[in-house]
Swiss-Prot record:
Pathway: Isoprenoid biosynthesis; isopentenyl diphosphate biosynthesis via DXP pathway; isopentenyl diphosphate from 1-deoxy-D-xylulose 5-phosphate: step 1/6. HAMAP family: DXP_reductoisom (MF_00183). It catalyses: 2-C-methyl-D-erythritol 4-phosphate + NADP(+) = 1-deoxy-D-xylulose 5-phosphate + NADPH + H(+). This is 1-deoxy-D-xylulose 5-phosphate reductoisomerase. Catalyzes the NADPH-dependent rearrangement and reduction of 1-deoxy-D-xylulose-5-phosphate (DXP) to 2-C-methyl-D-erythritol 4-phosphate (MEP). 1-deoxy-D-xylulose 5-phosphate binds at K137, S163, E164, S188, H211, S224, N229, K230, E233. The keyword Manganese applies.
Length: 402
């Protein structure tokens, strides 16, 4: 299960929880910072990490007063240092500095760096037994067995921040896992839920990022449009909750009110409901094991009285099939899936390939590269690099488009 039996360092001796936010200027990170700011009596910031948005990072640092602010892109180090001059806040840059920030003693770490780049800092936080609020599903997809082994070995606490896995976490009883019949992940269906394949072939990045319910970053918005996001979440749920692929189902739920469900063997189905606001699952993790108030709108069941559910269409959205196939193949297959998808999504956002070309790049990568065993982090890095190289060459050669 996700949570360790006896989590370490839930708060400091003064009752204040020290926190680090990895990926602080992204969608999840910005919402996390907003909640931390709302409770200055509960939280003290140790480190803030961003990829390259120095202006936003410096603004957050001036408000939260962390020990250090880190920009992953070393080219922006001078700008960050200048922006923090006279504040007493240390500035750092580069991948090693990101990992060092995760290693700093903080009770709670938000792991919100997008993509495989978040793996090493997430592992670093887990290895010192921190509470890790986990918003980076790609880490579990790339290296789920390795990460979960480190969580168990070091007594870390892993709390899901994806709305679906947070929902399951809130209604899943780990003491009665044999009584769980299945997990049901809900999906909005994204902006292309009713589109034909022909229409999707001409979709623009702007259309793919226009999610009907959620406000998210570009990459996860495209993944939602292709339903690859839900495929990655199936793999994530297997690792987080110890459930096999055959006991994890997906239902399309256009209203995004029921965030996911757990069905028990007696026929009972427990669900978590709420408005589509990422601040809610973030607050669940930030306050755990307590609850903290959020400023978002409350669910009005009368106005939301119509709740619809439908099966996903595997012909229009083959990403679900590809993700399940990678999970069943095991070894490096999920790592290849994730890396190829990241490359293809970026190429689509840059208008170098079409929307349906994303799945073609991913499928070809899975079919062409070996699904080797992953015994350590070096194996993960090798598989990830091989998949990125293959997918990038496919995009560059125009073989990803049709």
């Amino acid at each position: 299960m996700v949570v360790s039996v006896t989590p370490r360092h839930s708060t400091g001796g003064d009752g204040i929880r020290s926190v680090t936010v990895l990926g602080s200027t992204g969608s999840v990170g910005s919402n996390t910072v907003e909640l931390i700011e709302a409770y200055p009596e509960r939280y003290r910031t140790v480190a803030l990490v961003a990829r390259r948005n120095v202006a936003a990072l410096a603004g957050q640092a001036r408000r939260l007063r962390p020990e250090v602010a880190v920009v992953a892109d070393e080219a922006h180090y001078a700008d960050l240092k200048d922006a923090l001059a006279g504040t007493g806040i240390a500035a750092a840059a580069g991948p090693a500095a990101v990992v060092e920030a995760a290693q700093r003693p903080a009770d709670w770490v938000m792991a919100a760096i997008v993509g495989a780049a978040g793996l090493e800092p997430t592992l670093a936080a887990a290895r010192r037994g921190a509470i890790v609020a986990f918003a980076n599903k790609e880490c579990l997809v790339c290296a789920g067995e390795l990460l979960m082994a480190e969580v168990r070995r070091h007594g870390a606490t892993l709390l899901p921040v994806d709305s679906e896995h947070s929902a399951i976490f809130q209604v899943f009883d780990p003491e009665r896992r044999p009584a769980v019949s299945r997990l049901i992940l809900t999906a909005s269906g994204g902006p292309f839920r009713t589109w034909t394949r022909e229409r999707m072939a001409a979709a623009t990045p702007k259309e793919a990022c226009a999610h009907p319910n959620w406000t998210m970053g570009a990459k996860i918005s495209v993944d939602s449009a292709s339903m690859m996001n839900k495929g990655l979440e199936i793999i994530e749920a297997c690792h987080l909750f110890g459930m096999p692929d055959g006991q994890i189902d997906v239902l399309v739920h256009p209203q995004s009110v029921v965030h996911s469900m757990v069905e028990y063997v007696d026929g009972s189905v427990l669900a978590q409901l709420g408005t589509p606001d990422m601040r809610t699952p973030i607050a669940v993790a930030l306050g755990w094991p307590d609850r903290i108030a959020t400023p978002g709108a409350r669910l009005d069941l009368i106005k939301s009285s119509r709740l619809e559910f439908e099966a996903p269409d595997p012909l229009r959205f083959p990403a679900l099939r590809l993700a399940r196939h990678a999970l069943q193949c095991g070894g490096a297959a999920p790592t290849l899936l994730n890396a190829a998808n990241e490359v293809a999504v970026q190429a689509f956002l840059e208008e170098r390939i079409g929307f349906l070309d994303i799945e073609r790049v991913v499928e070809a990568t899975l079919a062409s590269l070996p699904h080797s065993e992953l015994n350590d982090l070096d194996d993960v890095r090798t598989a990830d690099a091989d998949a990125r190289r293959f997918a990038s060459e496919m995009v560059a050669a125009g073989r990803g488009s049709r």
